Amino acid sequence: MIRVSSAVQRHAQKLIVLFSLLFGASLLMSDNGFATDIKNTNASSPVNSESTKPTKAGEVKNVVRFAKTGSFDNDTVVRLARQLAKKPYVALKDPLPESLANISYDEYRDIRFKPDSAVWKADGLPYQMQLFHRGFFFQDLIEIALVEGNQATHLSYDPNMFTAGEVLQQNLPTEDIGYSGLRVHYPLNSPSYFDELFVFQGASYFRALGKGNAYGLSARGLAIKTADPAGEEFPIFRAFWVEKPNYDTNLIVVHALLDSPSVSGAYRFSIRPGENTRMDVEAVLFPRVELSKVGLAPATSMFMHSPNGREKTDDFRPSVHDSDGLLMINGRGERLWRPLANPSTLQVSAFMDNSPQGFGLMQRERDYANYQDLEAHYEKRPSLWVEPVGNWGPGAVVLTEIPTQSEIHDNIVAFWKPAQPLAAGSEYRFSYHLNWGAQPEANPQAITVSRTASGRADIAKPTPKRLFVIDYQVQGAKPAQMPEPKVRSNAGVISNVVLRDNPANNGYRLSFEFDPGEVTLAELRAELTLQEARPVETWLYRWTL
């Protein structure tokens, strides 16, 4: 059996608010541990660059412009991307038949892939691949090829693979209109069910699941000009080559060709399902223009509210978010935890580093009681941990937080921004691991932040002072001595700093008051100092009016 989740619905409902970003504050993590103000500054043509035109009913026209067929190896897509970058970018227009061009969300949702048509189902493999139809938001024609024995073959569109509503079923095209994406199923949670494992659909977006997870945040191939006042550029995966997996392996490999006005690229994803599903990513980029505002290993998520910042919400649910914090382990091995926020204005923070060990958007709150949502089950959303391979050099982890009033809007973006621009006409190779799961980054000895809450410091009378409460979880035995707390701010006044044992979680609770005075933005930092050598997370937070 195949258990079909709501991946299509979630992709469709998650409207991309990044297209209309407004001006916001940008800050940079400086050597003193605080953020300082920074200024917000501002593909080759395919083999056949003609638009695909619908053919007459009954006539089949295979569309192969990017997805090279025939002999295939690990450098095939790299060679295609290199050739693509030498020519001007061509914005392809692949009009859908009128019966599909303007369908509604409900009509698109009714177009369902038939599980019995899944690729490799008849082969008895542990993986089965399904395809997504074009339509609604997903208008781009995506080419897909299957690789077996070093040979790639084109996977043509077949209307018989889909069911649709009564009217639409009669009007599904017979010509090769391609697909809008793919998803792969695997018996992740039970030997008798093929659960969704990962999805590639929409621009360069993709997502995956660890054991027991439900879809939440997404990753992207590349981010360009995120939070730029002139608008963001969204590269697209034009074509995929999916290698047929072996019978006795837990590995499946997907190759992808990335294209945009600014860059072309070749990606190789080696995917291993498990408690934490791991993707080994190899990316080769060929900039057409200088890329000064580029984001590597970008993740996109949603944060609406939590116990830290509920004053602007009227919701029966205590928390609503796909991720609740940004975790970083910098090049010096320091663990940094930055709770997410739903700010009043666009906020962009940059945390300077040299050769980061890892970073990612985490969902740490795993108790249903803290969400109370019987449908969304935010407690099951995966975290995503990025592990760079090799020395990525100087740069910054950049966090973008966008105001939102609805959970259907992704409003959180995190990625690595190199310090030096990527030069036009050059070739860049980056490798990294993406780990999806409930605890993709777990240190058995670390003292970690488990919860951040804030509220008015004096409940008896109005006051600008804010009370912050931070809970720390101790992994393993507690230290023999109580840590020494230190709380700092680059503006305003910190007072009443108290650290006490928290028997409820075998950890500690740190509380303090913050008086912003006349400022509208401040960077807060809390540290616990131990007498013994043990990793302890440093808590960072941006307070805004």
From Swiss-Prot:
GO BP field: beta-glucan biosynthetic process
Keywords, ordered alphabetically: Periplasm, Signal
Subcellular location(s) per record: Periplasm
GO molecular function: carbohydrate binding; catalytic activity
Main location as per UniProt: periplasm
Signal peptide coordinates: 1-35
Record keyword DNA-binding present: no
S-S bonds: none
Any matching Pfam family: MdoG
Recorded metabolic or biological pathway in which this protein acts: Glycan metabolism; osmoregulated periplasmic glucan (OPG) biosynthesis
Record-level GO cellular component terms: outer membrane-bounded periplasmic space
Keyword Transmembrane: no
InterPro entries associated with the record: Gal_mutarotase_sf_dom, GH-type_carb-bd, Glucan_biosyn_MdoG/MdoD, Glucan_biosyn_MdoG_C, Ig-like_fold, Ig_E-set, MdoG_OpgG
Function: Involved in the biosynthesis of osmoregulated periplasmic glucans (OPGs).
Family: Belongs to the OpgD/OpgG family.
UniProt name for this protein: Glucans biosynthesis protein G
Gene assigned in the entry: opgG
